[in-house]
Amino acid sequence: MFYFRGCGRWVAVSFTKQQFPLARLSSDSAAPRTPHFDVIVIGGGHAGTEAATAAARCGSRTLLLTHRVDTIGQMSCNPSFGGIGKGHLMREVDALDGLCSRICDQSGVHYKVLNRRKGPAVWGLRAQIDRKLYKQNMQKEILNTPLLTVQEGAVEDLILTEPEPEHTGKCRVSGVVLVDGSTVYAESVILTTGTFLRGMIVIGLETHPAGRLGDQPSIGLAQTLEKLGFVVGRLKTGTPPRIAKESINFSILNKHIPDNPSIPFSFTNETVWIKPEDQLPCYLTHTNPRVDEIVLKNLHLNSHVKETTRGPRYCPSIESKVLRFPNRLHQVWLEPEGMDSDLIYPQGLSMTLPAELQEKMITCIRGLEKAKVIQPDGVLLLLPRMECNGAISAHHNLPLPGYGVQYDYLDPRQITPSLETHLVQRLFFAGQINGTTGYEEAAAQGVIAGINASLRVSRKPPFVVSRTEGYIGVLIDDLTTLGTSEPYRMFTSRVEFRLSLRPDNADSRLTLRGYKDAGCVSQQRYERACWMKSSLEEGISVLKSIEFLSSKWKKLIPEASISTSRSLPVRALDVLKYEEVDMDSLAKAVPEPLKKYTKCRELAERLKIEATYESVLFHQLQEIKGVQQDEALQLPKDLDYLTIRDVSLSHEVREKLHFSRPQTIGAASRIPGVTPAAIINLLRFVKTTQRRQSAMNESSKTDQYLCDADRLQEREL
């Protein structure tokens, strides 16, 4: 057994039993245990919690290592989940029995569906979340998950051993070394380090090492990864100051109320925990030219903006927006942080100016003329000497300005679609370490990494979601084939097959696979998904079988704009496509076969959606089949693109293929710089190789048959 100590050499260590100070044991026994797990997850953020619980659901003995147990479930930035594209990820995480959707249904204070003006394929489920309630509910779930142990500790290094010969990679991870020198061993390790890899907080011209305000960064682990040969990049993000609710003049602002009824994130919930009338509103205001003036006059005091490090394109700081789009008004959403919280989160005002300038800027905005910046609950500051409007203090009533965070990430083209790294076997990455931004993107990667880390332990095939199966598949495929040079955010526009990959049908796409192929889905959820699938198929069949003349339909449903000029019979499924018609009105017109389909609200709504997209879905399914054929053509894992001579590829293409190591022809075709001609040549090579291999296998079978026949003949003689 060996471990890598971040200094470029292999050091032998002995395997010893050791008792660890566990935050929670997965059994009643308190006896000392050998520190060996199936899966170790490093980091207790949104990716880490999903990864740890997914691995445990798959049957793996899992250890979650986090700096502080009391920060599990902490929403470090915005108090919201979901949105356009992100809401799809939430539904898919839930379809695989993930946590965040169910926890949001128990913790929200304002639920709304975005993009309602467009079709249901691109609706974005979103919720404002009570930070305190979310953290409580998440910790309760984590600390009561069977097979999952939680331990406080920081990881300094990785324990590495010789690689498995049947897999690519120069070594294999077999555990971790903590900062106190103790070791924990495992069959698979998942890194979900968020912004902690060499994290640096920035306010004005001041910087301080931290992965998040109040938490130390991970330096040793970052150095280890770099020395192992991983390509490391640098990204940045930021968060706005928090404002005292009582100091805001809401009466002059645009008020936005939640939806009624509220749509839950989870397929297992019919409603959310709180009634619409008890939910909190959000408010909208805008910046003005005075804000632009403050930003432009003080750029010399803002090192974060001057950095060449790339920040999030779709959630930029106010300084970046002013520089990129001068002389414009920018939206500022005032979002509640909880039912009992006196804090308001100003979405759109992420900034890193010195503290006194931040307050000056905020009071220039309509409704915020008397706004007071205060510190969020639960923040333990590690910046005793950073001067920001005096001194930053841990006292709640003193101001805490917005700040930026710069951190390391690893080029995601160094991981496979299962999120295992090419360089180190059984090492998985998930979340911001792969260059993404957002809770939802992190959670989606976390659940896939947890599943595959567990499957790797049991030597089962990886669980890969393709671009044709889910937004998760698009997210991971974009990362592993295209890479990213800025924080990656999910949008519906990134998805080719949006009409098939809708929020309403994520369970049909992923729950059945998750149960059969990964074992990460509970029996109860699986049975519910099977019932919904069979009910939809039966309902569509019944709707297709009911036919009347258009004149009769017009009499039965007079509110529908049905043309009576058609002479041919019209199916009930076609009538359901009209905007004015739903399953309730159809059931009133034809109660006998249709009434039972209105008893479940979700079933009735999904039948309406299926009817709406029936014709276009048929054509899209044909396109999906073509893509799936390309994805089915697997490339050899041990193919050396730099040296193979049987295929004509340019040096540039060889380098790109060597770096990204695509697993299929389809993935190779999406790598920038890999030409169509190169794909054709690669396709020919793969098919020729497959034919040769098949011929060799047949020849081997024939030889074996002849040998067996000779032996049989000798016995008879």
UniProtKB/Swiss-Prot annotation:
Ubiquitously expressed in various tissues, but with a markedly elevated expression in tissues of high metabolic rates including cochlea. The keyword DNA damage does not apply. Coiled coil: none annotated. Keywords: Cardiomyopathy, Disease variant, FAD, Flavoprotein, Methylation, Mitochondrion, Primary mitochondrial disease, Transit peptide, tRNA processing. GO terms for cellular component: cytosol; mitochondrion; transferase complex. Pfam families: GIDA, GIDA_C_1st, SAM_GIDA_C. GO terms for molecular function: flavin adenine dinucleotide binding; RNA binding; tRNA 5-taurinomethyluridine synthase activity. It comes from the Eukaryota. Gene3D superfamilies: 2.40.30.260, FAD/NAD(P)-binding domain, GidA associated domain, C-terminal subdomain. Residues 1-25 form a transit peptide. It catalyses: 5,10-methylenetetrahydrofolate + uridine(34) in tRNA + taurine + GTP + A + H2O = 5-taurinomethyluridine(34) in tRNA + 7,8-dihydrofolate + GDP + AH2 + phosphate + H(+). One of its GO terms (biological process) is mitochondrial tRNA wobble uridine modification. Its main location: mitochondrion. Component of the GTPBP3-MTO1 complex that catalyzes the 5-taurinomethyluridine (taum(5)U) modification at the 34th wobble position (U34) of mitochondrial tRNAs (mt-tRNAs), which plays a role in mt-tRNA decoding and mitochondrial translation. Taum(5)U formation on mammalian mt-tRNA requires the presence of both GTPBP3-mediated GTPase activity and MTO1 catalytic activity. It is linked to Combined oxidative phosphorylation deficiency 10: An autosomal recessive disorder resulting in variable defects of mitochondrial oxidative respiration. Affected individuals present in infancy with hypertrophic cardiomyopathy and lactic acidosis. The severity is variable, but can be fatal in the most severe cases. Belongs to the MnmG family. This is 5-taurinomethyluridine-[tRNA] synthase subunit MTO1, mitochondrial. It comes from Homo sapiens.
